[in-house]
Amino acid sequence: MTYTTRQIGAKNTLEYKVYIEKDGKPVSAFHDIPLYADKENNIFNMVVEIPRWTNAKLEITKEETLNPIIQDTKKGKLRFVRNCFPHHGYIHNYGAFPQTWEDPNVSHPETKAVGDNDPIDVLEIGETIAYTGQVKQVKALGIMALLDEGETDWKVIAIDINDPLAPKLNDIEDVEKYFPGLLRATNEWFRIYKIPDGKPENQFAFSGEAKNKKYALDIIKETHDSWKQLIAGKSSDSKGIDLTNVTLPDTPTYSKAASDAIPPASPKADAPIDKSIDKWFFISGSV
C-alpha cells in the first residue's frame, strides 16, 4: 500500500502541515493507516514525524481533522530540540505507530504512571534518513519506558524492513551486537534532551533497560486495544482527540467527506531556522 504526502505552507512556520494521502485523498495519520502492514509477521506501519539529525519538534496533531503532522509550539513559538553534545537534533528517525494510543486514563502496572495521550512513539534505527510523512514498514526489536513528567512514554526500537541489516536484527540483543553503543546513546539522549530548556533530567522505568521484542509486541497490542476503545467512542475520556476518519465506516466519527475539506497542496521552500538552534549544549555527566 503506497502513501503520499500533501504539504501546506513552509517548514519551520506555524502554517506548516503535512497530511498523509492514500490514492491522492487525505487520510488520518492517527486513525486511518493500519497499524499492521503484515500482522502474521509482526510488520508495522510507522508514520515518520521527524527525520534523524533534525531539530524541529514535529508531531501528529491530535486536535485537527485528519490529524496532520505539524510543528509543536509553546506559548505561540515553534519548538525545536536542542543539540546535546555529542548529538545533533533527534538521533533516530522518530515517529509513531498509527492506530495506537497511550491511554492517559490508565496507569501501567509496571511503570506506575499513566499514558501520555499520544500514539506510541517509534525510533527507527536504520541507515536511511526518512522524511516527514513517510510511511515505513518496520519490525519491532524492543522497547524503552521513558517517564516523562509523570507519564509513561513508551519508545519502540524498530528497523525498516528494507534496511540491509534488517534480516539480522530480530530482538533487542541484536541491536547491541550490530549497533554497539546505540541503546546507551538512546538512553542518554532521552535523559538529557530537555535540560537545555531548563527542565530536569528525564527518568526511565526498568532502570533504563530496553525490554525485548516480546515485551514490545505486548505493549504495542495494549496501545492498539486502547485505540480501538477510543475510536469506538468507548473511552472514559478521549481528551479532545479528533477521531474523524475516512476508512472506518463502523465508527461514529467516520466521514468520507472529510478528505474533500482539506486544502489543496501549497508547498513552500523551507523557512530559515534561527541560528541559535545550531548551538551545542555540553551537559555534565552526559558522555
Swiss-Prot record:
One of its GO terms (cellular component) is nucleus. Disulfide bonds: none annotated. It comes from the Eukaryota. Keywords: Cytoplasm, Hydrolase, Isopeptide bond, Magnesium, Metal-binding, Phosphoprotein, Ubl conjugation. Mg(2+) 1 binds at D116, D121, D153. Its main location: cytoplasm. Its EC number is 3.6.1.1. GO terms for biological process: phosphate-containing compound metabolic process. The modification Phosphoserine is found at S266, S286. Gene3D superfamilies: Inorganic pyrophosphatase (3.90.80.10). The modification Phosphothreonine is found at T65, T251. Its cofactor is Mg(2+). Belongs to the PPase family. PANTHER family: INORGANIC PYROPHOSPHATASE. Present with 68400 molecules/cell in log phase SD medium. Homodimer. This is Inorganic pyrophosphatase.
